[in-house]
Amino acid sequence: MTTSTMQQLKHDGDFSDELNETSTIQFYNKVSQQRKRRKTRTTFSNCQLNELENNFNRQRYLTPTDRDRIAKHLGLTNTQVITWFQNRRAKLKREAEELERDVMALRKQKQQKFTCLSLSDHDHEETQIDDENEQGDNNNDDDGDDNDVEEDDGEEQEKNHTKYLTQPPSISNILPSSLKHFPSSTLNTLEIDNKHETLNMNLFINPFSNEKCLKRNKDLIRQQCYLFNHHINNYCTVNNDNNINNNNNNNNRKNSIDGMNKGRSIKKGNKIWCPALELEQEIH
């Protein structure tokens, strides 16, 4: 290959590169011209925007007659009205999507809060169970202490029982509930009369034999009840005699008055109630 042919090929390659550069420059020039040919953005007045918004709220899509009417009323072209409605529908769609995303985000936040609260409640329940178990262990220890205390109480009760067996009860302790209104002076005299006898009887009681003590106390209780009833009967008979005398005097006085008024005598039954024995006796 000669030098002339090599130079020729080199010249052809340079020429092809120049052609490529010129073609790219022309392409960019065409694009820039097209950009320059774009129409300027139309500006709407406040009155036009308010009217377009009112029409959009009434109907999203316009019929040809409505489009012509709005264009004539606002002094706009049909294409301007169409583009405005298209842009407004696109804007409404974007707002709806954003609102839906916000709602989903709020729901996720609420779910996260709910899960956190449920986990905290579960942990709280576990801590309560642990506390209850600890309290149960403490209660078991306390039960052991209570058993010791109950044993001590049982020993004290046994001591009191032996003490009761060695000491006979007084008359005031064996007094029936129906005789609580009985005069206290009489009860005091009964206790004074029986004190000497009970003291003498206690001398023969053996505090170390429970059966003998119990039998002896029963005998003492019978004797005290007998003495107590004897004094009550004496007290009631005295009161009955006094009441009978008073009633006879009243009856005689009444019969004399009735005899003077009516010329005849009337016998009437009178009832006397003894508060100690709760008995009624009828006197004719």
Swiss-Prot record:
Localization annotation: Nucleus
DNA-binding region, residue intervals: 37-96
Domain of life: Eukaryota
Molecular-function annotations in GO: DNA binding; DNA-binding transcription factor activity, RNA polymerase II-specific
Compositionally skewed regions (Acidic residues) per UniProt: 128-156
Keyword annotations: DNA-binding, Homeobox, Nucleus
Major localisation: nucleus
Keyword DNA-binding applies: yes
Region span, Disordered: 117-172
SMART domains per the UniProt record, alphabetical: HOX
GO cellular component, one term: nucleus
UniProt keyword RNA-binding, yes or no: no
InterPro entries on file: HD, Homeobox_CS, Homeobox_TF, Homeodomain-like_sf
Protein name: Homeobox protein SMOX-5
Source organism of this protein record: Schistosoma mansoni (Blood fluke)
